[in-house]
Amino acid sequence: MPRIPVINTSHLDRIDELLVDNTETGEFKLHRSVFTDQALFDLEMKYIFEGNWVYLAHESQIPNNNDYYTTYIGRQPILIARNRNGELNAMINACSHRGAQLCRHKRGNKTTYTCPFHGWTFNNSGKLLKVKDPSDAGYSDCFNQDGSHDLKKVARFESYKGFLFGSLNPDVPSLQEFLGETTKIIDMIVGQSDQGLEVLRGVSTYTYEGNWKLTAENGADGYHVSAVHWNYAATTQHRKEKQAGDTIRAMSAGSWGKHGGGSYGFEHGHMLLWTQWGNPEDRPNFPKAAEYTEKFGAAMSKWMIERSRNLCLYPNVYLMDQFGSQIRVLRPISVNKTEVTIYCIAPVGEAPEARARRIRQYEDFFNASGMATPDDLEEFRACQAGYAGIELEWNDMCRGSKHWIYGPDDAANEIGLKPAISGIKTEDEGLYLAQHQYWLKSMKQAIAAEKEFASRQGENA
């Protein structure tokens, strides 16, 4: 029997036609069915969210021995636990007996987990320690042999500088290979402190009525900022004009993109949007400019302090260092519903004044009650509703195509960054093209795998 039922892909034989990438005619567009088709969503969950690397958590969220943290890989509940020796393990958060979730809170500290359903007990490395009422239970000889009834470990589980990723597919390439050039951007965030990063207390989780790709695109959409977030831009500009009232010292949205910026599309669907700040002196880490220059060089220091960065690690997380510093994690619930969870991040050992400013900037722009997030969610809802208008089939992505650069631009060359495509303006849309090219490649591989699986089933019937 198949581990997961075969997905019917018979209507997807012409999937190549869903993405138009024509450099001769200048047409770059995506068919809107990719946001609404149930079979495509099922393939995405199985092959992108469960069959490739996804972000799980940050090590600072499981800091102590015996701490645990719960999350998801696609549809499957995951438990990350630090055992008594300090080792991290990632396991399916389901009892090996009858499948009940073991850990039912987001986080905690336990040396063992006892299933509330039938009382089986596991240690925090996943080993089955005992079952309830074992005497004269009549278990088969094969019961609990060679770890047969231990918790199921996640097939691949790796960390990059504190960021934890997992995959249910044992054959994925190494995490370092998957992240590729984006590690240089991650290093900019982590390098702000010799002690690394930490996730601060507090979390905001919300859902919106729309496909997951809407937020995957939007976090690197520089074109929407002045339209959707005009109220925030006006508010921060008003504060700047009345300096006495600007206790938050928010980063200037009114000057977004006016001092330079751009975007990059990388292999494996990753993206980066960046801008040159109009007021870098209000960044929490601005006092460390000389230290960064000495440690990393002038070019890297400039990128770390004077430039905002929205980094999408495809498919499910943004690392943002801009109006606030945050980790934004998306989780598809259904083809037209998505959950988003955001955390404020900061360098370990940050000065109290800088930490307070960082938190206030984060609260100002983000959170479900911030001045920006609700605006984005309304546009996601409106887009998903608009996709029902199937007579208008395409999303256009040609903005900036006349000046896209295939490969690195001058700003990327400053730090040896090697993107697949560079947009020289923040409003350019070529980075979406790179992301959707990877999506299409993944979907074609998924369809081929499903057809092969269906064929083998037919032979064995």
Swiss-Prot record:
Catalytic activity: benzoate + NADH + O2 + H(+) = (1R,6S)-1,6-dihydroxycyclohexa-2,4-diene-1-carboxylate + NAD(+)
Cofactor: binding details: Binds 1 [2Fe-2S] cluster. Binds 1 Fe cation.
Iron-sulfur as UniProt keyword: yes
InterPro entries the record matches: Benzo_1-2-diOase_lsu (IPR017639), Rieske_2Fe-2S (IPR017941), Rieske_2Fe-2S_sf (IPR036922), Ring-hydroxy_dOase_2Fe2S_BS (IPR015881), Ring_hydroxy_dOase_asu_C_dom (IPR015879), Rng_hydr_dOase-A (IPR001663)
Domain Rieske stretches: 54-151
Biological processes, Gene Ontology terms: benzoate catabolic process via hydroxylation
Binding site for [2Fe-2S] cluster: C95, H97, C115, H118
Reported cofactor(s): [2Fe-2S] cluster; Fe cation
Pfam families noted in UniProt: Rieske, Ring_hydroxyl_A
Keyword NAD carried by entry: yes
This protein's pathway: Aromatic compound metabolism; benzoate degradation via hydroxylation; catechol from benzoate: step 1/2
Residues given in the record as Fe cation binding sites: H224, H229, D376
The EC number(s) this enzyme carries: 1.14.12.10
Source organism superkingdom: Bacteria
SUPFAM superfamilies: Bet v1-like, ISP domain
Enzyme class name: oxidoreductase
GO molecular function, one term: benzoate 1,2-dioxygenase activity
Alphabetized UniProt keyword annotations: 2Fe-2S, Aromatic hydrocarbons catabolism, Dioxygenase, Iron, Iron-sulfur, Metal-binding, NAD, Oxidoreductase
Annotated PROSITE patterns: RIESKE, RING_HYDROXYL_ALPHA
CDD domains per record: RHO_alpha_C_AntDO-like, Rieske_RO_Alpha_HBDO
Self-association state and partner proteins as the record states: This dioxygenase system consists of three proteins: the two subunits of the hydroxylase component (BenA and BenB), and an electron transfer component (BenC).
Function noted in UniProt: Degradation of benzoate to 2-hydro-1,2-dihydroxybenzoate (DHB).
Protein family per UniProt: Belongs to the bacterial ring-hydroxylating dioxygenase alpha subunit family.
UniProt-listed PANTHER family: 3-PHENYLPROPIONATE_CINNAMIC ACID DIOXYGENASE SUBUNIT ALPHA (PTHR43756:SF1), CHOLINE MONOOXYGENASE, CHLOROPLASTIC (PTHR43756)
Name this polypeptide is given: Benzoate 1,2-dioxygenase subunit alpha
Organism: Acinetobacter baylyi (strain ATCC 33305 / BD413 / ADP1)
Organism lineage: Bacteria, Pseudomonadati, Pseudomonadota, Gammaproteobacteria, Moraxellales
Name of the coding gene: benA
